[in-house]
Amino acid sequence: MKAGCSIVEKPEGGGGYQFPDWAYKTESSPGSRQIQLWHFILELLQKEEFRHVIAWQQGEYGEFVIKDPDEVARLWGRRKCKPQMNYDKLSRALRYYYNKRILHKTKGKRFTYKFNFNKLVMPNYPFINIRSSGVVPQSAPPVPTASSRFHFPPLDTHSPTNDVQPGRFSASSLTASGQESSNGTDRKTELSELEDGSAADWRRGVDPVSSRNAIGGGGIGHQKRKPDIMLPLFARPGMYPDPHSPFAVSPIPGRGGVLNVPISPALSLTPTIFSYSPSPGLSPFTSSSCFSFNPEEMKHYLHSQACSVFNYHLSPRTFPRYPGLMVPPLQCQMHPEESTQFSIKLQPPPVGRKNRERVESSEESAPVTTPTMASIPPRIKVEPASEKDPESLRQSAREKEEHTQEEGTVPSRTIEEEKGTIFARPAAPPIWPSVPISTPSGEPLEVTEDSEDRPGKEPSAPEKKEDALMPPKLRLKRRWNDDPEARELSKSGKFLWNGSGPQGLATAAADA
């Protein structure tokens, strides 16, 4: 041993704590395998010869007072082979434990601290052996052993409901990490779940052949297994729920003796040798915490997943691929022509400003052309009026004239009244009696064709584009102002307004 680095002797008999060999600083490895400070404090609290230095606070659960801070710092420096250790440095180490929720400072009391035994998870504090014959005072709290705080599920995977709260830590978590709270999340167990046989301590991890009847479901026949020291950090949590985990349990039992962890961001340093089975939290498989992995549930899940994909045009979610799993075929009701090839229908992009105006103009011009659709066949392509045959124009004019002569007789209106009625918006379109209007068959009715959904004569391409974007009423007004021939026809009483006399005028007014 080095000079000045004498080690506190391990308690052999009687009471107190029994630490493993790795917890003591050896000469061969001066910088590793150190014992933790809070281990050391608990060790001092268990020894009667240090009652004048540090002791449990009378009447308080888990609270202790440092009576001689300098002596405690000196003892800690001797254990760590640091002669310059003082209470200032030691208190900084204690403040580190505040965030880890191992202990906290008692307010209003100097040099008084309290262990947080309710939330304390001690994976690195094994082999604690509190004996009934020890010299612990009555006011001292019972130091929790790992078996009193956690349950360890048996290896029999056919009884997943025996342990409601499984153990997340085994004795294998002592593998030279030395960090007292690396996996110290807040996990509580109900007092009703603690069996009487849970007093078997962590020596089970060293003696692999020892009886496991002291754990959770003790009546189950157990099989021999490798020592926990040889296993990874955690016990098998694959088939058992964890209430603090955001994921549900995995449906596939893991390999015996090898860790099977759920995919969790909290476990960033887990090895990658396990058979990862993604939990149903990643894929909506079931809502229960434990379920039987039968083909009926698989079939129901695959059916609902495929139907949701087909209905909402979503890309299918990834499904965990298990090597020994036979997936039943889908049974979605699909037409035979759709089963061969499925085409995803995409929504068209929103129309721009020009396309929107064009759609609105076509919607407004559609009701205007409805009275004449019975007599005129629908046109597919918009053509200038100059290219049309004048014979067809004359024939359509005669049909319109015959249609208007069957309506009745009223005196013709003036131009101003007609223009005012066009841009008015009556509550209900009135009934228009028509007048007998005679149109000479020799004159081409370009203005009559003009009042429909396409321009009659288009001198240039920009004007054609402007007319296409223009509402039909404004286009009609502009044609009226620019065409002197139409004015002469109207003054002589021979002008067909909107192709069907006053009836077309009423339709245009109703659409305003």
UniProtKB/Swiss-Prot annotation:
Record's keyword terms, sorted: Acetylation, DNA-binding, Isopeptide bond, Nucleus, Phosphoprotein, Repressor, Transcription, Transcription regulation, Ubl conjugation
Residue ranges: DNA binding: 35-116
One function term, GO molecular function aspect: DNA-binding transcription repressor activity, RNA polymerase II-specific
Any one GO CC term of the record: nucleoplasm
Chain spans, region Disordered: 136-222, 336-512
Covalent cross-link (Glycyl lysine isopeptide (Lys-Gly) (interchain with G-Cter in SUMO2)), residues: K381, K388
Keyword Coiled coil belongs to the record: no
Organism superkingdom: Eukaryota
Modified positions (Phosphoserine) in chain numbering: S139, S159, S315
Comp. bias intervals (Basic and acidic residues): 380-406, 453-468, 479-491
Modified residues (N6-acetyllysine): K388
Gene3D superfamilies: Winged helix-like DNA-binding domain superfamily/Winged helix DNA-binding domain (1.10.10.10)
Biased composition (Polar residues): 158-184
UniProt keyword Ubl conjugation, yes or no: yes
Coarse class of the protein's main subcellular location: nucleus
Transmembrane segments: none
GO biological process, one term: cell differentiation
Subcellular location: Nucleus
Function: Transcriptional repressor that contribute to growth arrest during terminal macrophage differentiation by repressing target genes involved in Ras-dependent proliferation. Represses MMP1 promoter activity.
Protein family (similarity comment): Belongs to the ETS family.
Name of the molecule in the record: ETS translocation variant 3
Organism: Homo sapiens (Human)
Gene that produces this protein: ETV3
